[in-house]
UniProtKB/Swiss-Prot annotation:
Keywords: Aminoacyl-tRNA synthetase, ATP-binding, Coiled coil, Cytoplasm, Ligase, Nucleotide-binding, Protein biosynthesis. One of its GO terms (biological process) is valyl-tRNA aminoacylation. One of its GO terms (cellular component) is cytosol. It is found in: Cytoplasm. It is an enzyme of class 6 (ligase). It comes from the Bacteria. This is Valine--tRNA ligase. Belongs to the class-I aminoacyl-tRNA synthetase family. ValS type 1 subfamily. Its EC number is 6.1.1.9. Catalyzes the attachment of valine to tRNA(Val). As ValRS can inadvertently accommodate and process structurally similar amino acids such as threonine, to avoid such errors, it has a 'posttransfer' editing activity that hydrolyzes mischarged Thr-tRNA(Val) in a tRNA-dependent manner. The lineage of its organism: Bacteria, Pseudomonadati, Pseudomonadota, Alphaproteobacteria, Hyphomicrobiales. Its main location: cytoplasm. ValRS has two distinct active sites: one for aminoacylation and one for editing. The misactivated threonine is translocated from the active site to the editing site. HAMAP family: Val_tRNA_synth_type1 (MF_02004).
Amino acid sequence: MLEKTYDAKTVEPKIAKVWEEADAFRAGAGAEEGAEAFTIVIPPPNVTGSLHMGHALNNTLQDILVRFERMRGKNVLWQPGMDHAGIATQMVVERQLMEKQIHRRDLTREQFIEKVWEWKAESGGTIFNQLKRLGASADWSRERFTMDEGLSKAVLEVFVTLYKEGLIYKDKRLVNWDPRLLTAISDLEVEQHEVNGNLWHFRYPLEGETFDPENPKTFITVATTRPETMLGDTAVAVHPDDERYRHLVGKNVVLPIVGRKIPVVADEYSDPEKGSGAVKITPAHDFNDFEVGKRHKLPAINILTVEAAIKLKDNEDFLAGLDATPERQAVWDELDGLDRFVARKKIVELMEEGGFLEKVEPHRHAVPHGDRGGVPIEPFLTEQWYANAAELAKPAIASVREGRTNFVPKNWEKTYFDWMENIQPWCISRQLWWGHQIPAWYGPDGRVFVEKTEEEALSAAIEYYLALEGPWKAWVEDRLENFQPGEILTRDEDVLDTWFSSALWPFSTLGWPDQTPELKTYYQTDVLVTGFDIIFFWVARMMMMGLHFMDEEPFHTVYVHALVRDKNGAKMSKSKGNVIDPLDLIDEYGADALRFTLTVMAAQGRDVKLDPARIAGYRNFGTKLWNATRFAEMNEVARNDDFWLNDAKLAVNRWILTELTRAARQITDGITSYRFNEAAGAAYRFVWNLFCDWYLELLKPVFMGTDEAAKAESRACVAFVLDEIYKLLHPMMPFMTEELWAQTAGEGKERESLLCHAAWPSPDFEDDEAAADINWLVDLVSGIRSVRSEMNVPPAAIAPLVVVGANGVTRERLVRQDSAIKRLARVGDISLADAAPKGSAQIVLNEATICLPLGSLIDLAAEAARLQKELAKVTEEIARLHKKLSNERFVASAPAEIVEAEREKLAEYRDAQDKLAVALTRVRDAG
């Protein structure tokens, strides 16, 4: 006998242990002979990470697909693994070392990396245990890590191959530079922070004019939020159609403080409507300016150190062509070495003293910050390794255009194309110690040798230098003669961008570059489930690498899920204090309740607004199923292997089997089309509404009656439907359903398999007549209950029922279902009439009008007054909200989640208004 209540805290670890001991999720477990493969690779969470709501949604949806296809008999692999998370992991270990007063630079690179591996062994990967608590059914025996031996081998193979194909190269370009972490970072690691700053308007004197701050003809005004970068200005840009400046194009201005003569160039980047219409161009310190600089062949002058301090001394690019007068030199010396923000204040002072500061305006604007270092990043000109993304992107664009890979929802394809068709070279190097060290070695003259191993690089270098004539040949020969070959090459210290190894994930985890059986079986993978924020950083790059090295797309479908927000629609963040920890929710409500809630709310293209109250509600759904199973047990329901669907004779049983067939199709269609919310909704409606509320209720007289054949049939039918329910719900609610499956095997019996390996339901039973008959009864009783509720009829009151205009079918149903109608709708005599009695509330069902004479049961006038008062109150609220939402200022300035919440309130009030109006009309008509 089942326990009285379901205890998730007891059942979930028990079931997890059962799965683990049975090795239930290994690749191919439960598959039919020669089954088609189904593969998903997990988006590898950071080794430093812990489970957040985004992970919970992402992995719940993956697990639904995986469990569903496993039950459909496919050869399933859900490949788990973790990302080495270069910057994040290095920071964690550095912080730990600093607690012991040890700086990273106090250690050798090898010693530090050893510390990182020690940390991973002790603390890394806690997220996998958390995912297991969620119920994730990955093949945990195949766990991979982007720095493990096999994946490192794949990374070397890819880098060396792309380099030798000319698709990886070194270049000097602008990067996002984190001056705290001292490394280039990706766009994904940059956060935009709104800050209250200033817009400084500077006067740049025209060459050949005597500068007069009172005479606009002697200068051109530019505005900037970053005065410190003016030291690296190499042009002023104006729009080619701007009549105010057309006569100045081609002329020079003299850069204050510096004395550099820089040209006025015509470029569409300048906006005539913004500020003065003229903008300073600093190619070495602004991404847009860098592009302007390329178009006009302007020099790029870097005036910052890697720590973002001013660097003027010995800066050849800065000093080139300048007249270093004693006055200027003194100013430069004063600025040299200053922190960028200290220098900003000093430069503004100097500009003001020289009459070059026209005005200062308060200006709120976005400043990019490193998400790990937490300081403003610098667009920084530095030599880095790059991949030719434009070339690699071409096949990846074609794959989506030609439908070999599809995005769901389809609108994300536009985002993909926008990114891919405007792609820039991919900066793949990082100035870190933790990561895949770039397999490049430099000879004594700076020549690069790229090979998989140092031995191969040294061999290539020796061959190259010994074929030369001159000093380098002699130098190398000397090292070889003195047994010092190790001095010939110096390895590049940089590591690869974490996304580089992640881009190989779908095939490297299967053993590539070796042609393993797993690679042949499970590549290409079927679907990638991911958030929209990494479509470019990860999805696009997997497409590039998969097509280049496997000559096949890594997946045929990319399902892009939405964000999980708080109940008000606000993005979760620690600063707002609205972060919800999924483990807390699992502790309180159970994993199944959390999973089902996320599934119900996972509508395509709509963010999930997570309210813990909803999770409590869906926990009640699990309780409902548990109690339904207990009810079945108490009524001696047991599995009967001899039960055949077509043998069912009772209309109520034939009805539930028909509805089961329909629900199974809806759930299957929902999952296969990635409409998870529709699948969950269909399951909820069938289990709660049809099975529990109606079917079991309609069976009570059967179980209490004396017809043994009807009892036996109904018991077998209930057992069959419950088994199908467990299967249909299993992908969404795996723990409870697996427990119920085991507990209902029958006395002294065991199931043939775990539920996770049971065959997916495909019932094929349709009895339209029985379905129409019972659904008519459900609609009739529901309509009567609705009227009673709307009109405040006391629950115990028995009302007569009068039916007007009934045809032969309805009359026959009224007779056949007489006892059920009276019991479920709480009505007395049922009669037919030609007209509705006075004082009756009416509903229309098919051709008939159903009348409830209520005049003797309620005070119709008082009820009308109550409804009128409620309707007036709701109408007043609608007017207030409509006025608020018609205020353009409110809509534009209020946080988006507040506006959305008000819109939802308005929709709720309008719905209430409609219902109250219907109820009021009914009362008045009855009176």
